[in-house]
Swiss-Prot record:
The organism of origin for this protein: Ligilactobacillus salivarius (strain UCC118) (Lactobacillus salivarius)
Record-given protein name: ATP-dependent helicase/nuclease subunit A
GO molecular function: 3'-5' DNA helicase activity; 3'-5' exonuclease activity; ATP binding; ATP hydrolysis activity; double-stranded DNA binding
A single GO BP: double-strand break repair via homologous recombination
Entries under InterPro entries matching the protein: AddA (IPR014152), DNA_helicase_UvrD-like_C (IPR014017), DNA_helicase_UvrD/REP (IPR000212), P-loop_NTPase (IPR027417), PDDEXK-like_dom_sf (IPR011604), PDDEXK_AddAB-type (IPR038726), Restrct_endonuc-II-like (IPR011335), UvrD-like_ATP-bd (IPR014016)
Family annotation (NCBIfam families): addA_Gpos
Requisite cofactors: Mg(2+)
Length: 1248
């Protein structure tokens, strides 16, 4: 805020009002911290000592900031104090500040426990479990023991519980459920009572189902809410039809509303479940009124309204029938009773787990954060003289309890605070913004805030609600844009609160100069081309998703570069001037960390400096993956994947050809056996230089592995890890890699994790590796070690991580990221209010059925998800001070507009509830809201939007920009060194350098260096891994004789596109290419597949070929487009030829599609490389077919080349067949007697 700030009337009330409970609803940027500090100072002025206040903050950083601000404020008051008495007061308060109760609730609870531990007979000598991983490790250990205990009981009830939530492979599902249920229970003041209530929800009693509390309190209100939602759709349809003059459509919706009213009345009065079930299952709207003589536009509008609103209402009623009323009453009761038994057993198991976990923590003298809260509450509620004395002492001590970020508290924390609070009058001062409650995954309960928000506003309540609506952070365009979105999105139905006049942001940052640029932009990447693969490439299922992310990131980087390099301006609050944007002014916020690795790579490539504090998951970093692989093989070397990972890593340094060589020398058994076999059988005198080099590497590796394995048996895990660092030099090596400091910090962190593991009295490498693997499986990665923040770089963080922060320029990335609804598909749903809803798995039929409790829990989960995602979007938008950019991706502009136009005709300010609830990403919400503004017509003038009056009055400006692949293509070939700023900097350095004076001798030395030629320059351009087909394609005119002896002539001019053979310039990413028609290569591959799959019967018929081709298309091994191009007659003709008949005759001796790999010295393969060069090349390929007779082998290769002469086929493929022959003779130890090319196009065999 600007200097000379004056408090608003609402802020003044929040500072001065007293004698009651006060809830301050402080919108984003409203200065709530300033108000809290000023309230503390005001209390001190009134004679309250700072140690008589309890100030609870959400984080330790917030508590530290609060103390610092209070200290500054007290010093200011001291400097202006008139009397000695005042000065003494402020000096006394400054001296007490360090011991004042300004802390997180956990820190306050820890203080209570340390001071009053004797009340509950707690051993005061305990250590805090500050790491989540420590807690998880201990829980795993306790659960493993308890689970075995339950299994040994052979309890039928426990067996049913296991079967219901486990797979046929393991019981991880049950383990996860127990841990989550324990977590939910522990967020309550009385966990056992909450667990008991889980069971009581399933007790329907003996009365009819519709008389049960569950039906009356849960099902019936939900059913009526859904019917009302359908009715709201129909009413909106009536309004729209009426305004468009569609009389018959209006009449249709009018009669539909009447039908819905009848259904609503029936539900209210119905007393019998099966009657209601039958009514809903048979429910239909009456036939729509016929509407002739409409013009094209009216027809289009009618179709849209019917599809969106009438069909939507039908779907709502159908869902009621399917989800709630699928079963008759007796089956519902039976299902519920069986499910009750399972929930009862679950409750019992979780209670026992909680008791055992507590017992184990006491045994180890440790406490976790949950213990702090429960033990504090236990102390306060202990009904003994000591317990009652402690509670009264704390109540009398604190004249006021101030709670910051009140919306993020849970029921347990609320109970602790209200236990020591005064009742009449109240003395709680709670500050927060329920629109920023985004920690549902931590079991924060925004309902506590909402309940007070509504009740404190009523006239008959003694407590007070104060609203701080002014936003002193953002420019008017940002606040107006936020209001534009949320006034249409958020209400009690979808969002849990109304975004009304009380909730809207009020522009208060009047200190921005008028000339400060205004920007709010929506950037859409059109990903249509990115979902298409080139014709000769296999389809990767994740490809389109990855490239949507890449397209968004390139688009974002492009826009950021434009802002910085074009000198776009922002207002610098500290300097009080307008200046050009710098990278440090920009923050990228994302819903998840999923794309951080791509983001880091792309920004670096495009020359945009970036700081990503959590760029990748800790155990997904290269250095940690290598170390974990090493630890795995130290525990057990007979694991191929981690073994090869270590061998290939810098620790051992084997190349791909060396790895292949080891396997070729021993094709049976585990890979470690192949390594040992090579080492044990190595003969120095017969070894090539290649083998000798490999042997030396393996010898060092095996020596180190033996040493490490011996050390591991002594259970010295941390020492073992450090020994690996010392012996291999790996810690130093990663320090020299890009991001070396971060990598070294990560390796140090692994050492520290291992030390912590051992401190917990856990031993053994196997258990440590197993624990880490479990953590990764559950997506509970450890935190990455932190390093220094870059000075001038774009900051990247999650939206959750940005809460409480502000940035001049904000990019909300991946706004089309789908909300995570994966939990809804699990066989259980947990809810703090509704308990648990489960799916029941019939042990006999294996059929899974959702209980009514699961249906209710699902509805609640979706409602809470939508509300929390809405709040998350609010947090993201309100981080921006001056400029806001929202980034997303659609297939194309039409797809985006079609989704955004769904709600344009609604004249009410808030969009249709059903449409809002059905949305699964931020951008669809935002787009729907923007289309109703007149400004949007600049994007699409066909939008027939009904702009509500409030939106029209908003002083908002925004742009929507669409970027295609073509727009971004130039960005994909820009390297970071080619950025304009980098080039200018380098040129300036060169210009400032003084010219060097050199003598003749120095000149000759430099000249010799510059003119020298690397003797095997061609090898530098050659990959060590070659496909036979690539070798063939690399030469337009290979010398036949030299090919025969495997001396292939190198040509300096290599055809473009042979990028497997030559390490050429990088080609464009696949998403920058477009799909072309069916290629000959595709037809060739498909033809070979057909020949491979064809049964070798006595006679091959055309009908058989057609059936096989149809099957391959059905199995999606060949596309229908490619199948049309395959010439089946040519294949039939082949089997009537001499070669074809020989294949059929010797079908048991025929091998088809035979893969091979062999090592060939480069000097033998390439004619321009010296023959004595031992640099090996790994050649691999697939032989179409061979016939293995007693003492000879015939190899054959099908060719689908069109219009190619016999001589040209020989010229093109002789070398390839020679390589095949060499490979076959090496593998089978038999002479290849014939090498045959069969041309399907010519219909003849060509013997070489």
């Amino acid at each position: 805020m600007a200097n000379g700030f004056k408090f608003t009337p609402a802020q003044q009330k929040a500072i001065e009002d007293t004698g009651k409970n006060i809830l301050v609803a402080a919108s984003a940027g409203s200065g709530k911290t300033r108000v809290l500090v000023e309230r503390v100072i005001n209390k001190i002025k009134q004679g309250v000592s700072i140690d008589e206040l309890l100030v609870v903050t959400f984080t330790e950083a917030a508590a530290k900031e609060m103390k610092e601000r209070i200290q500054i404020a007290l010093r200011k008051e001291l400097s202006t104090a008139d009397s000695e008495e005042e000065k003494r007061r402020y000096l006394t308060q400054l001296s007490k500040l360090n011991v004042a109760n300004i802390s997180t609730l956990h820190a306050f609870c820890l203080q209570i426990i340390k001071q009053y531990y004797y009340v509950i007979n707690l051993d005061p000598m305990f250590r805090m479990l500050t790491e989540d991983t420590e807690v998880a490790l201990l829980q795993e250990n306790v659960w493993d023991d308890l689970r075995e205990k339950w299994y040994s009981k052979k309890s039928p009830e426990f067996e049913n519980l296991v079967v219901n939530f486990s797979s046929d492979r393991n019981d991880d599902g049950l383990s996860e459920l127990v841990m989550k249920t324990y977590q939910f229970a522990n967020a309550n003041p009385n966990p056992d009572e909450w667990l008991n209530n889980l069971v009581s929800e399933y007790d329907l009693g003996d009365q009819p189902l519709m008389e049960s509390n569950f039906y009356q309190n849960k099902i019936k209100p939900n059913v009526l809410d859904q019917i009302q939602l359908a009715k709201d759709n129909l009413k909106q349809g009536m309004d729209e039809a009426n305004k468009l003059g569609l009389e018959k459509l209006y009449q249709t919706f009018e009669q539909d509303c009447a039908t819905i009213d009848e259904l609503q009345d029936f539900v209210v009065g119905c007393k019998e479940w099966n009657n209601l079930k039958t009514t809903l299952q048979n429910f239909k709207f009456k036939r729509a009124k016929s509407d002739r003589g409409l013009d094209d536009d009216q027809k289009k509008q009618k179709e849209r309204i019917n599809k969106t609103l009438r069909d939507g209402s039908k779907k709502i009623i159908e869902d009621l029938s399917v989800k709630y009323f699928a079963l008759p009453e007796d089956e519902i009761k039976e299902l519920t009773q069986k499910s009750k038994q399972i929930v009862e057993t679950l409750s019992e198991v979780v209670k026992e787990f909680g008791a055992e976990f507590s017992k184990e923590k006491r045994r180890r003298h440790v406490l976790d954060f949950s213990d702090l809260e429960h033990l504090t509450l236990q102390i306060l509620n202990t009904d003994t003289p000591d317990g009652r004395r402690v509670k009264e002492r704390l109540k009398n001590k604190f004249k006021e309890i101030m709670v910051d970020e009140y919306q993020d508290t849970n029921q347990l924390q609320e109970t602790i605070l209200t236990t020591i609070a005064h009742k009449n009058p109240g003395n709680m001062f709670m500050v927060g913004d329920v629109k920023q409650s985004i920690y549902g995954f931590r079991l924060a309960d925004p309902g506590l805030f909402l309940k007070k928000y509504q009740s404190f506003a009523t006239d008959d309540n003694d407590d007070e609600r104060i609203i701080l609506a002014e936003n002193f952070r953002s420019m008017e365009n940002v606040t107006a844009f936020t209001n534009l979105i949320f006034s249409q999105l958020m209400d009690e139905k979808v969002g849990e609160m109304a975004y009304d006049e009380d909730a809207r942001l009020v522009y208060g940052a009047k200190y921005y100069p008028e000339e400060t640029p205004i920007k709010a932009e929506v950037l859409v990447y059109e990903s249509e081309d990115s979902s298409q693969e080139s014709d000769d490439e296999p389809v990767n299922e994740d490809f389109s998703i990855d490239n949507k992310a890449q397209g968004q990131i390139v688009m974002t980087a492009k826009r950021i570069k434009e802002l910085v390099e074009n000198g776009e301006k922002i207002y610098d609050k500290k300097q009080g001037t307008i200046r050009p944007i710098e990278y440090r002014d920009i923050a990228i916020l994302a819903p998840t960390r999923k794309n951080n690795l791509i983001l880091t790579e792309e920004f670096k490539r495009l020359g945009v400096p970036i700081f990503v504090p959590d760029a990748q998951n800790y155990f997904q970093t290269t250095e940690l993956k290598i170390m974990m692989s090493f630890l795995q093989i130290i525990d057990n070397p007979y694991q191929d994947i981690p073994l090869v990972a270590v061998l290939r890593s810098p620790i051992v340094g084997l190349k791909e050809n060396e790895l292949a060589y080891l396997r070729i020398n021993d094709k049976t058994g585990d890979y470690f056996q192949a390594v040992e076999s090579f080492y044990d059988n190595f003969e120095v005198e017969k070894a090539s230089a290649f083998a000798q080099s490999l042997y030396e590497k393996i010898a060092i590796f095996l020596k180190q592995l033996t040493e490490f394995r011996n050390m591991a048996q002594q259970n010295e895990l941390a020492s073992l890890i450090w020994k690996i660092y010392e012996e291999t030099g790996f810690l130093d090596y990663v320090g020299g890699m890009p991001g070396g400091l971060q990598r070294q910090a990560n390796l140090h962190a692994l050492y520290e994790r291992a030390a912590e593991y051992e401190e917990m009295s856990f031993k053994g490498l196997f258990q440590f590796v197993r624990f880490i693997n479990k953590m990764q499986t559950k997506n509970k990665d450890l935190s990455e070690a932190t390093t220094q923040v870059s000075d001038d770089a774009v900051t990247v963080m999650t939206i959750h991580g940005s809460k409480g922060l502000e940035f001049p320029v904000v990019f909300l990335l991946d706004a089309t990221h789908k909300f995570n609804v994966g939990d809804l598909n699990k066989p259980y749903l947990l809810n703090a209010d509704d308990g648990i809803g489960i799916s029941y798995l019939d042990p006999d039929t294996r059929v899974k059925t959702d209980t009514l409790m699961k249906v209710i829990a699902g509805k609640q989960a979706l409602k809470k998800l939508a509300a929390e995602q809405m709040r998350l979007l609010y947090v993201a938008l309100t981080r921006a001070e001056q400029q806001l950019f929202i980034v997303g991706s659609y297939k194309d502009k039409n797809e985006a507009l079609s989704k955004w136009k769904k709600a344009t005709q609604s004249e009410s300010l808030v969009l249709n509830a059903g449409i809002r609830a059905s949305v699964r990403n931020f951008m669809d919400w935002i787009g729907m809201c923007l289309t109703r503004s007149e400004i949007f017509k600049e994007v699409d003038d066909t939008v027939d939007a009904k702009e509500p009056e409030y939106i029209g009055e908003l002083p908002v400006k925004f742009e929507v920009k669409f970027y295609s692949n073509q727009d971004l293509r130039g960005e994909n070939i820009t390297l970071d060194e080619n950025s304009e700023s980098w080039l200018k900097q380098q040129l300036k350095k060169i210009e400032e350098q003084e010219p060097l004076e050199i003598n003749d001798k120095q000149y000759r030395i430099i000249d010799k260096i510059l003119q020298s030629k690397y003797p095997n320059e061609s090898l530098a351009k050659t990959t060590a891994y070659q496909a036979v087909s690539d070798l063939k394609r690399a030469f337009d005119d290979p010398d036949n004789n030299m090919m025969q002896s495997l001396e292939i002539d190198w040509q300096d001019q290599v055809p473009q596109g042979i990028n497997r053979y030559v390490q050429n310039e990088l080609s464009l990413p696949k998403f920058m290419t477009t799909k072309v028609k069916v290629s000959p290569a595709q037809v060739g591959i498909a033809t070979h597949l057909l020949l491979q799959k064809l049964p070798l019967d006595d006679e091959v018929t055309l009908e058989e070929l057609m059936q096989l081709l149809a099957q391959l298309v059905e199995d999606k091994l060949i596309t229908s487009e490619v199948a049309k191009e395959i010439n089946l007659n040519q294949i039939k003709v082949f089997y009537t030829s001499d070669l074809g008949r020989k294949v059929l005759k010797n079908k048991d001796k025929v091998k088809r599609e035979l893969p091979f790999a062999m090592i060939i010295p480069a000097g033998r393969l390439f004619s321009n490389v010296d023959n004595d060069v031992e640099q090996p090349i790994l050649v691999h390929g697939i032989i179409d077919g061979l016939i293995e007779l007693d003492d000879e082998v015939i190899i054959f290769d099908y060719k689908t080349d069109h219009h190619t002469s016999e001589d040209k086929l020989i010229e093109n493929y002789r070398g390839q067949l020679n390589l095949y022959a060499m490979a076959v003779e090496s593998m089978l130890n038999k002479k290849v007697s014939q090498k045959i090319i069969y041309s399907l196009d010519l219909g003849k065999s060509i013997v070489l």
